[in-house]
Amino acid sequence: MKKDLLREFSLIFLIPKNIYLPLSVFGIIFLIFLILDFDQYLNYASSFIASFITVFIISESTFKEDYQNGYIEQRICEGRSLVSYLFAKYISNLSLVYLPMTAIAFLINGFSEGPALEFTFAYLVMLSTLYFFFNLGSAISLRRNNSLNALLIIPLLIPFIILVKEIFVDVLLEPNLNFLMAYFVFSATFVNLSLIHISEPTRRTP
């Protein structure tokens, strides 16, 4: 696990665009909405839209390089766990990308309509859930060599979008925050198990 964490953090630090590109995209989209001078409720919606687009862009390259250079296949052939690999990728993105995105959203919106701690936590859970689902779409696209296969995750996102709207636009934390947390747990387990299953056909007999 430690080795995987060091690898993923090093990959992000050694390629600075992995940090500044998503944060720049997020900030630019957010700035556009601010210039358009929407009211506060639409600012929360713009925060979600900016997050949605940014996480989607990140997910497009999450596994691409490791898949193309054979790193994932090598791990499978060596019998090394993909769970620690997936966990390390999530922790590195959470620490270096999603936490700064949450800070930017907090500084701009302020989450003034409710408790800051709960809204900050909900925002991180929202970003993490998007991360898992978009990664599933990215993995399906790589495995089948067809980006349209990623559309399969859209039905899974519909209930999630409704939950996010009720939390950040309607400001209804209870019981939606609990539902959002349950959706996060579902996405983390279901998606990671699916990713491991998707990778299994690439095994080769030594």
What does each model-identified segment do?
Residues 134-135, 159-169:
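Transmembrane alpha-helical segments of integral membrane proteins
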Residues 62-94:
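Helix-loop-helix units of permease transmembrane domains in multi-pass membrane transporters
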Residues 196-206:
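Single conserved hydrophobic/aromatic residue that forms the stacking wall/gate
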Residues 82-109, 184:
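Selective transmembrane-helix segments that form parts of the transport pathway or gating/packing helices
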Residues 97, 101-129:
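Secretory targeting signals
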